[in-house]
């Protein structure tokens, strides 16, 4: 069975909430292409784009993330529950920003 993006979003939200990580749906009127979620925990702010397995970010999303990273933002693309769990481990257990290379390219 293929997981839908909404299933991944539900899993993501549940896991982050259980860990005490603030998670907000990120919408920016007039600016398409921003990541889906903002995470805030222990003085760290991250942006996460959630995709169904096998789906790739749109070119506008890739360009927006490139501009954000150029200014020091931490942005990740996640498409599996394993990646959600890895992100949670890095934030809650390792107390470190995850390596962007451990996630899907964006």
PLM regions: where:
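Catalytic phosphate/metal-binding cores of nucleic-acid and nucleotide-processing enzymes, i.e., regions
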Residues: 1-106
């Amino acid at each position: 069975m293929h997981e839908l993006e909404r299933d991944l979003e539900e899993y993501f939200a549940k896991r982050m909430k259980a860990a005490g990580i603030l998670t907000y749906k990120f919408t920016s009127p007039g600016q398409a292409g921003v990541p889906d979620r903002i995470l805030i925990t222990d003085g760290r702010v991250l942006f996460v784009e959630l995709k169904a397995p096998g789906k790739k970010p749109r070119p506008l999303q890739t360009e927006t993330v490139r501009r954000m990273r150029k200014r020091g933002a931490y942005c990740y693309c996640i498409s599996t529950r394993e990646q959600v769990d890895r992100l949670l481990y890095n934030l809650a257990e390792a107390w470190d920003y995850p390596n962007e290379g451990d996630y899907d390219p964006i």
